[in-house]
Amino acid sequence: MATYIVGDLHGCFDEFQLLLEQANFDPQYDELWLTGDLVARGENSLACLRYVKALGERATVVLGNHDVHLLSTLQGIKAVKPKDKVDAIFEAEDRLELQNWLRSRPLVAQHPVHQFLLVHAGVSPEWDLATTLACAREVEAVLQGEQFADFLAQMYGNSPDQWRADLQGIERWRYALNVFTRMRFCYADKRLDFDCKLPVEEAPEGLKPWFELDNPFYRQQPIIFGHWASLIGYQTPDTIYALDTGCVWGNHLTMLRWEDKHIFTQKRLNLD
């Protein structure tokens, strides 16, 4: 049995299938972990959702910002952006089933054997493992509860941008969701920045990647994430694995086989 971890799909279903073929992925024996953002911008978000859902317990996927935004559009909270190319999901007979499946996905997942932590964007520089998992479970409970639409309507925004243990309600949940699905850079005082999406080398002075801030937890166990395609070629610390390599933007899709750390890649097909 092998454990495969795939970066952001963004609707790139054909590339996803070719990547699995390279590794001879067999869902009967192997397990698949995905960094989220299954949907948006690529040509076949619907197929990505259906395929991963059909794998059942053989697949573990964490929610990304585009996945959460899709939930908002399905609820009529936000308008659909044509560039997201998700119309087929709205027209699908199983859209409600897909929505309910998607909102029941975790924000953070820890492998029971290998102990790596999977998250879409990152882990707060102010959290340890216990706080990370506790905050994830809190927000997951809201997303999976009866008031999830109310939460989706209030989740947008950049405040608060710094953790406090006494945060409560929507402020606590928004901070946690932003960390798990949107974070890239932080300031030295560990405040989150949501404006800069540049490669690290081009970032304004005073900003650092979240994983380069001083947090002993980052060195205690592996953390695998996606979300940040402009990290391609950047040397992360040994315990940090960045797997979003911008397939939807014309680069390639990346998959890591955990047991031997072998990397599989698949170039983007047929760009518009």
Swiss-Prot record:
Pfam families: Metallophos
InterPro entries: ApaH, Calcineurin-like_PHP_ApaH, Metallo-depent_PP-like
Keyword set, alphabetical order: Hydrolase
Keyword hit for Hydrolase: yes
GO-annotated molecular function: bis(5'-nucleosyl)-tetraphosphatase (symmetrical) activity
Broadest EC class assigned to this enzyme: hydrolase
Record EC number: 3.6.1.41
Reactions it catalyzes: P(1),P(4)-bis(5'-adenosyl) tetraphosphate + H2O = 2 ADP + 2 H(+)
Coiled-coil ranges (or none): none
Role of this protein: Hydrolyzes diadenosine 5',5'''-P1,P4-tetraphosphate to yield ADP.
PANTHER family attached to this UniProt entry: CYTOCHROME C5, PTHR40942
Family: Belongs to the Ap4A hydrolase family.
Full protein name: Bis(5'-nucleosyl)-tetraphosphatase, symmetrical
Gene: apaH
